[in-house]
């Protein structure tokens, strides 16, 4: 079993900061790294720069106890968690420059035995690409793509699966998918997350872990889009969509979601494009223009000319602010 005393979290947004604070609350020494000087200063004062229930209390306690400290420059640690944005460039192409920058930033402080984890939602192959960038910057160390199980540095992907507004609870309670580039990488990553995760830590390979997160969010995207289109159709046909869905869901194998203002959040509306980019020739259904307009560009009932704001919108998830 791998022992960890210190963790560096690269990117202190809506995933990185809660993750850093949660590790710190379990007694690890945590170094949070971010290029945003304001975020760094705010955290070091025991405050938070994003809105997330309970996060302020966890951060304040961790900083007060000396377990969490923020900086703009990476420092040595036993494990590194990369939680930076993965936006799109023109043409719906994933932009991995933040991952590349993070890799080059941590490379100088890596030492034999360290673990590097990519948490950012990424196209398939991004973890391997991150490992390649690290290897290029540190030719004196061996990495999984060349040395396999015997590599000096272990590399894995562990996608976040939390709901904004419930991040602190779900970080601890949700199952985690652990995808290492080798079995040794997976085991080391599982040992790290077991420090605070009460859910199951399920081991697989890096590519499967990457695809798992994309599949989860794409599945939700499709189902939300279906519910929203039903709402528009029912409005045309003078049918109560809520009653319709309630009755249809009495079928034991049907579970239609409720219509709403469309797909939101940081991931669900864009993750299908990661799948398309990873296998454009094979992702014919998801990449088909008409289908893409429906599920990927899903604007929900707001695109409907007769969209109406109803009290049911109050049932939406609480509003939260922040970047990954």
Residues covered by each model-derived region:
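Structural/interface elements that position substrates and couple domains in central-metabolism enzymes
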Residues: 1-324
């Amino acid at each position: 079993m791998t022992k960890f005393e210190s963790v560096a979290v690269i990117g202190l947004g809506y995933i990185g900061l809660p993750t850093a604070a949660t590790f710190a609350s379990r007694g690890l020494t945590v170094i949070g790294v971010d290029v945003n000087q304001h975020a760094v200063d705010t955290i070091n004062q025991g405050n938070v720069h994003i809105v997330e229930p309970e996060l302020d209390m966890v951060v304040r306690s961790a900083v007060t106890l000396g377990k969490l400290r923020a900086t703009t420059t990476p420092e040595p640690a036993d494990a590194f968690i990369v939680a930076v944005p993965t936006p799109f460039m023109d043409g719906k192409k994933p932009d991995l420059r933040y991952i590349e920058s993070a890799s080059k930033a941590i490379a100088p402080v890596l030492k034999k035995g360290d673990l590097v984890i990519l948490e950012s939602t990424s196209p398939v192959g991004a973890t391997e690409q991150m490992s390649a960038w690290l290897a290029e910057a540190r030719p004196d160390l061996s990495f999984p793509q060349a040395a396999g199980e015997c590599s000096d540095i272990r590399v894995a992907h562990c996608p976040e699966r939390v709901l904004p507004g419930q991040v602190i609870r779900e970080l601890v309670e949700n199952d985690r998918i652990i995808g290492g580039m080798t079995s040794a990488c997976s085991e080391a990553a599982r040992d790290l997350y077991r420090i605070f995760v009460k859910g199951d830590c399920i081991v697989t390979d890096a590519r499967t872990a990457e695809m798992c997160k994309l599949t989860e969010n794409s599945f939700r995207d499709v189902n939300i889009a279906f519910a929203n289109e039903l709402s528009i159709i029912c409005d045309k046909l003078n049918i109560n969509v809520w009653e319709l869905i309630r009755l249809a869901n009495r079928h034991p194998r049907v579970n239609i979601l409720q219509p709403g203002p469309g797909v939101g959040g940081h991931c669900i509306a864009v993750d299908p494009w990661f799948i398309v980019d990873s296998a454009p020739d094979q992702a014919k259904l998801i990449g088909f223009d008409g289908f893409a307009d429906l599920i990927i560009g899903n604007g929900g009932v707001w695109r409907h000319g007769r969209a109406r704001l109803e009290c049911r919108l109050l049932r939406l998830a609480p509003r939260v602010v922040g970047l990954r």
